[in-house]
């Protein structure tokens, strides 16, 4: 199974590169433009999808102005089954998204592989209503195979400005075995993280080519990194309070 899993992951990545490259470039241009215009990059996902938002936040070699929206009841550590129940609730999203600082100069990524649950859809609609450029990382195969749970009947890919297909299969699990009754081994987190890092890398290059110093974190385990990073944190701490939460003034 080890070889098969790596093979399947490579197949998904090749599909993304082949079919989504134009949209990856569009996303990178939007990110580059947002940062140059004083905006930030915001990300939201429920359950395991939040892992991708965390992957690119405060990341060595990553873009500084990245703000994940963490809603703990929608993550896993406060109750896994409960988090799924809440994600399926219509009108739950306003309880947290309405108080978020989302601006028209921002880019907002919504991460949901199935794309059918109300909370990610409502978050996308809220971000769009505030003028942000919305990008979904989702699976079109998966989404189109299942009915929406949103009261409007729409799926995530139908409400955003740009869609990047992660090419996950229906149900996300990619492997089978004759003695196992259900498919297993998901791909969406690995592929989604690659998509995000590729988009941000391209955006960093675009800024540099435009004569703009890209705000990039150095690894905190490299000597001199604290001084380098402190300058960028100071610049973005008001828009991204989670960068300094819990620190002494």
Swiss-Prot record:
SUPFAM superfamilies found in the cross-reference section: SIS domain (SSF53697)
GO molecular function (one): carbohydrate derivative binding
GO biological process, one term: carbohydrate derivative metabolic process
Entry-linked InterPro entries: RpiR-like_SIS, SIS_dom, SIS_dom_sf, SIS_GmhA/DiaA_subfam, UPF0309
Domain SIS: 31-214
Membrane-traversing stretches: none
Xref: PROSITE patterns: SIS
The protein, known as: UPF0309 protein GTNG_1302
Organism (species): Geobacillus thermodenitrificans (strain NG80-2)
């Amino acid at each position: 199974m080890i070889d098969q899993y790596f093979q399947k992951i490579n197949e998904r990545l090749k599909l993304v590169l082949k079919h989504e490259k134009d949209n990856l470039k569009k996303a990178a241009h939007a990110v580059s433009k947002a940062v140059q215009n004083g905006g930030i990059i915001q990300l939201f996902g429920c359950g395991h999808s939040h892992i991708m938002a965390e992957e690119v936040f405060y990341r060595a070699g990553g873009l500084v102005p990245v703000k994940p929206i963490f809603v703990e009841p929608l993550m896993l550590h406060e109750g896994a089954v409960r988090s799924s129940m809440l994600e399926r609730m219509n009108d739950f999203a306003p309880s947290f998204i309405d108080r978020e600082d989302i601006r028209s100069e921002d880019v907002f990524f919504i991460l949901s592989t199935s794309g059918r649950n109300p909370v990610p859809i409502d978050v996308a609609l809220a971000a769009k209503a505030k003028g942000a450029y919305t990008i979904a990382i989702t699976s079109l195969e998966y989404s189109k195979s299942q009915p929406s749970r949103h009261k409007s009947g729409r799926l995530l890919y139908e409400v955003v400005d740009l869609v990047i297909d992660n090419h996950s299969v229906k149900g996300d699990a990619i492997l089978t075995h004759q003695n196992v009754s259900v498919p297993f081994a998901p791909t969406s987190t690995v592929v989604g993280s690659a998509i995000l890092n590729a988009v941000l890398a391209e955006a960093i290059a675009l800024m540099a080519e435009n004569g703009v110093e890209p705000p990039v974190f150095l690894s905190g385990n490299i000597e001199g990194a604290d001084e380098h990073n402190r300058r960028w944190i100071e610049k973005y701490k008001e828009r991204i309070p989670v960068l300094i939460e819990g620190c002494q003034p």
